[in-house]
Amino acid sequence: MDDSPWPQCDIRVQDTFGPQVSGCYEDFDFTLLFEESILYLPPLLIAASVALLRIWQLRSTENLLKRSGLLSILKPTSTTRLSNAAIAIGFVASPIFAWLSFWEHARSLRPSTILNVYLLGTIPMDAARARTLFRMPGNSAIASIFATIVVCKVVLLVVEAMEKQRLLLDRGWAPEETAGILNRSFLWWFNPLLLSGYKQALTVDKLLAVDEDIGVEKSKDEIRRRWAQAVKQNASSLQDVLLAVYRTELWGGFLPRLCLIGVNYAQPFLVNRVVTFLGQPDTSTSRGVASGLIAAYAIVYMGIAVATAAFHHRSYRMVMMVRGGLILLIYDHTLTLNALSPSKNDSYTLITADIERIVSGLRSLHETWASLIEIALSLWLLETKIRVSAVAAAMVVLVCLLVSGALSGLLGVHQNLWLEAMQKRLNATLATIGSIKGIKATGRTNTLYETILQLRRTEIQKSLKFRELLVALVTLSYLSTTMAPTFAFGTYSILAKIRNMTPLLAAPAFSSLTIMTLLGQAVSGFVESLMGLRQAMASLERIRQYLVGKEAPEPSPNKPGVASTEGLVAWSASLDEPGLDPRVEMRRMSSLQHRFYNLGELQDGLIVLQNHTASWEKASKPVLTDINVTITRGSFVIVIGPIGSGKSTLLHSILGEVPHTTGIRTIQEVDTAFCAQTPWLTNTNVRDNILGASHFDPAWYNAVVKACALHRDFAQLPHGDRSMIGSKGILLSGGQKGRLALARALYARKALLVLDDVFAGLDPKTGQEVFTSLFGARGLLRQGKTTTVLATNSTQNLSMADYIMVLGSEGRLIEQGTPTELLNSGSSLRLEELVKTREGKSKAEPERERPEYARALRNSVLGATPVAARRRFSDMAIYKLYIRTIGWGSWWIFIVLCSGFVVALTLSRENTLALPSACAGVDLLTACLEEIWLKFWTEANARNPHDRLGYYLSLFAVWSALAITFFLGACLHLMLRMVPKAAKIFHGSLLQTVMRAPLVFFSKTDSGEISNHFSQDLELIDMELPRALIGAVIALILCISAMAVIVYSSNYLAATIPGLLGLLYLVQMFYLRTSQQLRVLELETRAPLLSHYMETIQGLVSLRAFGWSKHFKDRHHGHLKVAQQSAYLLFCAQIWLTLTLDIIVAFLAIILVSIAVTVKNSSAASIGLALVNLIAFGANMKGLVYNWTALENAMGAIARVRDFTTETPCEIQVGESHSPSPGWPQRGLIKFKSVTASYDFTSHPVLNDVTFTVQPGEKLAICGRTGCGKSSLVSSLLRLLEVRNGAIEVDGIDISTLSREDVRMSLNVLPQEPFFYHGTIRQNLDPNCLSSDEEILETLALLGLREVISKKGGLDVAMDDGFLSHGQQQLLCLARAILKKSRILILDEVTSSVDQETETLITRVLRDRLQDQTVISIAHRLNTIMDYDKVIILDKGCIVEQGNPQVLALQRSIFASLLRSGDEEPGNGHKHESEGEEE
């Protein structure tokens, strides 16, 4: 006899498909046949099939675990009386699962996903079967077996879910990689980071490791290969490449999104079932139905939580991979760009603004197709509830979708216009930061400030049309939410009254309202995802156009990789040879197998040019014409010629960098090193700059350091050669930067060395020492038999060359040969330069002064130890700062409009209560809202069908119209008034801070960090903040109102509110401490990536010449991995918060339904209202989290801007705001009175007790060895240094009392490094528009530039990189100085980069046109200052000698010694020509 406590059910009932049993168990159970055929067999068959495939896959992988005993537990089989097939299949599947468990354990990092999903899914099904069997007569034994099976499965699930980090052979795996399906579903692996961030400050080292997919380690080769194939096949669709590479991650989001659709659309059925249940009287089945409804709500809402988290997780992973892949492609292509390519600077916008738009757009990629499915489902479900009336809602949706589709097409167009304007502003800003020293020196900060502000205003103006379209699209998305219920319910009610049908009652009304809530979410999701996708596609197209740009140069002769170390050639050096160590071995490049880039025979020539013509632009006049030359191995070749003759272009031609050439260029494949005119340095320490991509060899390193005369500089550095040099080595002297770049080229030990005017900026003695150490008979390069090509403007030391090439002004080779051949042929070169012996200059006196920058920055960034940056968390102060920026009045208008929208939406959709604080007139409004409109309407219909239909319907429509009006007003006010105002103010504050920062600040702060403020931070403030702000504000108000309605509709639920608020407070406190730090880290880790990118752009030619492209790719990838890591973990933090809040909503749903179905003391309409609001609450909570996290991110950018503007020092001090009288200085009298100066008040002085006087009209020369303080003296006069003691007077006025900008604008300065604005020739020559065109053209003609400028387009042509050679740029600066009227002229080595003819021209112009001005000139070429009135000799920041140069030259003076060494001056040209400019 059966002992079952439940009523018996006949087997004939259980043998039907059902699925619901009938006639027993209170009709609340499945039939046994349904359970076996649906709940048991399909999951078993699917799991077994997938298990076999997985076993086959795992067999080909390697073992990942340590050897250990493996306990395999076979799944117990079960039998039933109804299905032998179930027994057989279960029996067969059991060993398959055991086999799979073994292979998964040994060959997989994670616990078996298949087994975990199967066990987790079938345990509830088996429990249901066990319950059914227990209720069957005479089946207690089988039921007990099934109950045992359920227990065993639970045990197996626990065992299979156990992770195996401790058993792995390699412990370096990321936590996510080893996490099981349950761990990943609930993000348990992320909890340690949250705990760590809660307890302590996070740094990059403390972040969780992420897998190689996120770091783009796995996909980098594939995406490069596929893109190369696409370009080669002229099928360069970037979208297709991304789909092919990341298809797995893309498809990975489909399943969880489909599951999310399923559980979301179970909600209307549940609402309808609960409302119907509450409207029915209690029966014998009520208890079972109530329990089933509670369980169903638990399953659905927990399913929503897990599916949402899984979907977002997969989406974010895909987005991060795409982000990393695109940045890699952009960087790779940048490495191939021509040095003068204008797009290389534009690419900065691509990796900042465009990438962010792509990330933002692709995050909602799956919403596009999912929303369409949800819209279709919603309309179908709505049709089942309100029949033909659903057509009205469908028409509203259709109109919104069609208009949205049409408008979204314009979105990409106007976004590109905005981005182009942003690109111009960023390029000008980056150029300004890069030339800040020259800009400050010339007093052009105000001019540049206004110029960039105007570019910002133009950018904001360009963005307005885009913002208007954005507002229109967002409004359309809300239009369907507000108007669809009005049209649907209105149509239903009218038709019901006309046809005398059942009126609108609670069950269909609230289930329909639930469906329309989901419909509104779907339409909003589609429109927003469409907007994001359009923006992403527009940015992808911009990136694609950049990647397919035909701007790559010809292949360089250099072989990629580091220098070969084969073929060691021993050499020795005598101790009297400067800079050489006799213990060092010189490694010469092995003779590589010959490969030719062009046809022709090399014979003995390493480089052969035949009829070679070269130009930088295809349609322009050739820079080089008909060049024929052969350069043999091991030779030292000097290339000379006047400025603009094409010397730099010839060197670039040898390197394969000139894009347009004709003739034959034959170069043997050799490893090459290159030194550009502008020394290219990276923001690392001194040693790393010298090593580059080479390995450290102490002996060779020391030999190179001595040869470049750097060892004495190292001795004065706070940390020796481990001292940081700052961005571009900003406070290094020109000579020090040049020698550092030269040392890098020497250390690389390349077979071919190409030098472009590298001795410029060196004082005669230091220059001669380095020159002899390299090219003397026992010089470093001579001993190594290195082929060297040196371009210079100087004719000094020509006798030491093996071969000389003389270029004419038209770019033709007018003379060439050995010094002897040129001497015998009657060369135009000076005779004495051709007959000097090569050994006569080996006794150069070493320079012994302490470098001025070492003294100045002993305690600065050069010696700083990197520390973790402070974390500034966004707080209420940041929000208040933003509100103050836009204005409190504007803010309250925005809040009132948002509140009006929510109140109107409340009454139109009838799903919330307005809070008294929402607006004024509280009493009246509260009285009107005491009963909710739809609840009131449906209850009235239940009492009196169709009564006062017009009243209810008209107010319904009014509230809908008001809602959309308020929303449109809020959006327009935000986007067109608040955002532009904030954009202008924050940018202006940043720019003003940079312009007012002291010069030393730029040596302590990485340029990438500064640039990050102007790109990423402003991008967040401009774009992310407004979208997040309006979304967060509205979602917050809706959440509060929805919660109020839920409590109002279910009194018992009010008891949970204190606990809910406490829980939310704990969650946000726990979450915020970590997420805020992650947000700051995410922004901070971008700075090294951007800095590295900018350094790469600046050194493109050098990178390719050295063959270091791969090394820099690897370094870039390292920075990218760190940036990806922090960004991905920030996304994971947001997913964790969404999951947590969804689980809280699930518990609320369970509590609400449990109270409703068990107590049943509320009306069906009230509970329906509460359930609809619960759905809205969940959706709005997600919207709040999504927008709030984005808002916090943007507020983090504002916090960074605030910190930057408040913590950056300002060079303007108290008491120096006075302005000089107009026309000051009128005389030009300069007095230094015991001046001691330093870069700031905390660093070591660079000038000590300097006293001298320059009378009006006198010409003063400042001389001395490199680093002696010459530039510091001039900088102190220009107020770039801080005068700690003494005073500097100009025309009797202490300049420390005057505005720094006024002082600089009143003086006339020709800086060592020419700089130009991003504007026309006219704007650069006459920025204040004080000269006529005739005066400008006359000045240009005086300097021989009028014809050059005319050929390039005249005064109104825009200047860009490579517009003029460096020497021509220096002449253009001189023209600017002539046009500027000032009594004092400051010259900083203005003749160092020009040939003798141009030097004579400059000297004559200075004498004839500026004879009445007081002149202070820094000079290395002492022959140019012999007619000066006075000369000052500096050493270690002190005046060691002063007097008339002609008098001192005849005495046994320091000046006479320098003058004699000046006759031995090496090739002195200027060092600051950009790599792509031709000389």
Swiss-Prot record:
Positions bearing carbohydrate: 183, 234, 345, 427, 611, 628, 793, 797, 1161, 1187
Record-linked SUPFAM superfamilies: ABC transporter transmembrane region (SSF90123), P-loop containing nucleoside triphosphate hydrolases (SSF52540)
Spell out the InterPro entries in the cross-references.
AAA+_ATPase, ABC1_TM_dom, ABC1_TM_sf, ABC_transporter-like_ATP-bd, ABC_transporter-like_CS, ABC_transporter_C-like, ABCC_6TM_D2, P-loop_NTPase
- The chain's coiled-coil residues are none
List, alphabetically, the GO terms of the cellular component aspect.
Answer: plasma membrane
Q: Where is each ABC transporter domain found?
A: 607-835, 1230-1461
Region listing for Disordered, in residue ranges: 1460-1479
Residue ranges annotated as compositionally biased, kind Basic and acidic residues, are 1461-1479
Q: Which residues form the ABC transmembrane type-1 domain?
A: 258-535, 932-1193
Tell me the residue numbers annotated for binding ATP.
Answer: 641-648, 1264-1271
What are the record keywords, sorted?
Answer: ATP-binding, Cell membrane, Glycoprotein, Membrane, Nucleotide-binding, Repeat, Transmembrane, Transmembrane helix, Transport
Keyword flag Transcription: no
Task: Please give, as recorded in its UniProt entry, the membrane topology of this protein.
Answer: Multi-pass membrane protein
Q: Which PANTHER family match?
A: ABC TRANSPORTER ATNG (PTHR24223:SF399), ATP-BINDING CASSETTE SUB-FAMILY C (PTHR24223)
Free-text function comment from the UniProt entry: ABC transporter; part of the gene cluster that mediates the biosynthesis of echinocandin B, a fungal lipidated cyclic hexapeptide that acts as an antifungal agent.
Report the protein name in the record. Answer: ABC transporter ecdL
